[in-house]
């Protein structure tokens, strides 16, 4: 219950942050900074994954790629996401930042706190948010929607990997 209350407070603070008429938030270049910060925060939680005994002992899918693949894929996806968000700024800013927030906390929930079931719920939420975001992007700028598709596809793949771990461990 305490964790739920903390999550509610965090989301309320995040919402207040988004609603502020901030020059920084209304600057389309800030989207690159937020994307970079999310990449760094997510990376910090999983930087020790190859040496993490908990992760190594999990039963993983035969489709689970080697760790270096994640290190190659995520920066590319973040780059494509940030270009997409930049092209449609500020129309999709709030939804983009919200999904970015959940993307960053997924890594912490899964890798740092070892809560794969909660991480699975978060990734399903991420998929829903990003389908909605991609629909919005398509209405505004078709190229932005196309740039976002690899991320959505990767989220489906990541949710499969996450589900496999939940079911088989």
Q: Which role fits each region the language model picked out?
A:
Residues 108-118, 168-169:
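Membrane-interface helix caps and helix-loop-helix hairpins in membrane proteins
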Residues 74-85, 99-102:
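Core segments of transmembrane alpha-helices
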Residues 7-10:
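Intrinsic disorder
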Residues 60-72:
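Short aromatic-rich membrane-water interface segments that cap or initiate transmembrane helices
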Residues 137-153:
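Interfacial loop-to-transmembrane junctions
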Residues 49-62:
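Membrane-interface helix termini and inter-helical loops of multi-pass transporters
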Residues 25-45:
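N-terminal signal-anchor transmembrane alpha helix
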Residues 160-169:
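Juxtamembrane boundary at the C-terminal end of a transmembrane helix
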